[in-house]
Design a protein with these regions (language model features):
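Active-site and adjacent substrate-binding regions of carbohydrate-active enzymes
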Residues: 436
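Short, small/polar-rich motifs associated with maturation and membrane association
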Residues: 1-339, 344-345, 350-353, 357-359, ...
Length: 527
């Protein structure tokens, strides 16, 4: 009986091995090894070409001699892709497939902005990333910088701790972590004018954004561009009848999940289960997160008009945004105006243009200071046993119950307002002197005014505030003047040799933090 069982088991195992061998043989015969060489139209090998079986992750890459090898079934499709060349798809019907890729003329002839002028992408040897308007992020963004999030390799954007702020910290890969603030920031250029604030540009007015890195940025703009350059090109008017465009959106923000905190009833049940008495239980069951937060709404409107003739074109736009914060007492509103006009003369050899940008931003915020006077901390740590107001209608302030101030008191009695006014005007001239030789001149003036208002009412719980209220106002003004003139010579000889020379002069004067500050207190009333 035992011998019969062993013999049957051996026969079953032999059959299983035979089936596995046949299956592996079938797969081996189904998978063809395809080899070949990928070249350009002149026959030069192309290293680094991606060879991929369409619809799968099965792929390979060409070596320094343009050769590749890949296992793929007959009848499947191979895709050959390489930067600057059009992608080819070939159905596998033989074991050797040699491919000649054609240059993507559209991609190579794409014009990119490099600072003092522009070049076709095929002539650029440095790292430049271009993001067109239709590829920018879509959403309720307060800063144009946020439109680039996730679009540029190595670009990190950190939003201000105030969610309604128009300021975002930007760093490009390679910037030193030992520095902070403006020392980490890239250099901004708007419509060819260096050092222009991004707050003067409405996201809807952006045509494209070019990001320059490595030696190109420093060679053009010097050490101030050591962290890279972000070049913003705005939309311009075109010849034709006037066109009016209106766009708008409405959005809502809400905190999806808060920290899980003990309610007052949870705390009382815990005390009862563990046989201890809670001191300072005022019978309330306050959800401070719910009291402090809200559903916030944002609405944005943009109106633009553009048009022109064969000689003259113009563009004007107005953008208005109003954004609430999810924390009560926080909000911002912003108004941006822009006007541009350009005209041609001397048989189109002379181009004159003027540009004017202005913005006003108001930002209301709440106390986010130290451990005891932060609304964000207090809404999580203030005792749920305490009501919002006492029996007399005053904000509760029970020393010993919580080390924080009443968060609703800080929102309503400690007020912070920040206003920014910015204006920038530019005049440009460009003259084609002879074939290939062009003269350019730019004059720019930028004025930025900052106002900080801080008012603590007589009902403020802050210990440093005087009995009858305290107010602080600070204002500063920054001025920037820029004049640049340069000659560009760009000539191609015999359709093969290309010569480019740039000679220029740049002057810049900046005055920062010119202002005053004042603190007053002991008011008659809070009006």
């Amino acid at each position: 009986m035992l011998n019969v069982q062993l013999k049957g088991k051996r026969t079953w195992m032999q059959s299983l091995l035979l089936v596995m061998f046949l299956l592996s043989s079938t797969l081996a015969f189904a998978q063809n090894k395809v080899t070949g060489t990928v070249t350009d139209k002149t026959g030069a090998p192309l290293p680094g070409v991606n060879v991929l079986e369409k619809g799968t992750t099965n792929g390979s890459i060409t070596d320094v001699d343009g050769k590749y090898s890949i296992n793929v079934e007959k009848g499947k499709t191979l895709m050959f892709s390489y930067i600057g060349f059009t992608t080819r798809e070939i159905v596998v019907n033989q074991n050797v497939i040699n491919v000649a890729l054609q240059e993507d003329l559209q991609a190579l002839d794409e014009v990119v902005v490099i600072g003092y002028g522009s070049m076709t992408r095929k002539d650029v040897t440095s790292s430049i990333t271009t993001v067109k308007a239709d590829k920018l992020n879509v959403g309720t963004y307060t800063s144009p910088a946020q439109l680039l999030q996730g679009k540029v390799p190595g670009l990190t954007i950190t939003q201000s701790s105030d969610p309604n702020s128009e300021y975002s910290s930007i760093t490009l890969r390679g910037a030193s972590s030992l520095r902070g603030g403006e020392a980490m920031e890239p250099y901004y250029v708007v419509d060819g004018v260096p050092g222009v604030s991004l707050a003067l540009v409405a996201p809807e007015d952006i045509e494209s954004i070019d990001v320059l890195r490595d030696a190109t940025a420093t060679a053009i703009y010097g050490s101030k561009a050591a962290n890279g350059v972000i070049i913003v090109t705005t939309k311009k008017g075109k010849a034709g009848k006037a066109t009016v465009t209106y766009s708008a959106y409405i959005a809502a923000d809400k905190v999806m999940k808060n920290l899980d905190m003990m309610t007052a009833d949870d705390l009382r049940a815990y005390a009862k289960a563990n046989n201890f008495t809670i001191n300072n239980d005022f019978g309330a069951n306050t959800d401070w997160q719910k009291e402090v937060q809200r559903t916030a709404f944002t609405h944005n409107h943009n109106v633009s008009i553009s048009g022109g003739s064969d000689r003259t074109s113009y563009t004007a736009s107005i953008n208005y945004m109003e954004k609430q914060g999810v924390i009560k007492g926080t909000d911002m509103d912003r108004l941006i105006g822009r006007a541009f006009v350009q005209t041609r003369a001397l048989n189109d050899r002379l181009i004159l243009s003027m540009n004017l940008n202005a913005s006003i931003t108001n930002n209301n915020s709440v106390e986010t200071g130290g451990d005891n006077n932060s609304v964000y901390d207090a809404m999580n740590y203030y005792s749920p046993l305490v009501p919002v107001r006492d029996e007399n209608g005053n904000w509760t302030n029970y020393v010993g119950v919580s080390q924080n101030y009443n968060p609703l008191s800080m929102i309503n009695e400690d007020l912070y307002h920040h206003q920014t006014k910015k204006m920038q005007g530019t005049a440009k001239a460009s003259l084609d002197i002879i074939d290939g030789l062009q003269w350019n001149a730019t004059l720019s003036y930028q004025n930025e005014q900052f106002l900080w208002d801080e008012y603590h009412t007589s009902q403020s719980q802050m210990t440093y505030v005087k009995d009858n209220g305290q107010a602080h106002r600070r204002t500063t003004q920054d001025l920037k003047k820029v004049f640049e003139t340069y000659l560009n010579y760009d000539k191609t000889f015999n359709e093969v040799h290309k010569l480019g020379i740039m000679l220029g002069y740049s002057w810049e004067e900046t005055t920062k933090a010119d202002g005053y500050g004042l603190t007053v207190y002991d008011f008659y009333n809070d009006d």
